Amino acid sequence: MSEPTSSRPAYARLLDRAVRILAVRDHSEQELRRKLSAPVMGKNGPEEIDATADDYERVIAWCHEHHYLDDERFVMRFIASRSRKGYGPARIRQELNQKGISRESTEKTMRECEIDWSEMAREQAVRKYGEPLPSNFSEKVKVQRFLLYRGYLMDDIQQIWRNFAD
């Protein structure tokens, strides 16, 4: 199968760029498309790649076919990474939505990940406010606000005081 010489270099450059991007960390398909379409910094400033839409589609298909690009694997690793950093399910869902991951895929993976979000919320609260957790109303509100900002659900936050009474 012979390709035109003008599209071969653009395709090859795109493919090389995609592999380099995916070698650093997993990306969603939407993230990879955005990064591939962004101008490349050359010696004389930003340079556009003269690739066609077909070149982009072929590169994405090649990455899927060779398992460089896998949205399901990306979602699993992203959830694990963000939960280790102390973020809750609401914030993780929002970030995955921004990265172009479908709600169904996110929900399916969140169910499979088996993370105890109320325990994670408690760990974050203890890390920030110390043990024992505050019991007066105004201090509890501060803890709740902090955990809501981190993306935890109100049910998980309320579990802290229900299950872990002093």
UniProtKB/Swiss-Prot annotation:
Keywords: Cytoplasm. GO terms for cellular component: cytoplasm. Its main location: cytoplasm. One of its GO terms (biological process) is regulation of DNA repair. It comes from the Bacteria. It is found in: Cytoplasm. The keyword Transmembrane helix does not apply. Modulates RecA activity. Belongs to the RecX family. This is Regulatory protein RecX.
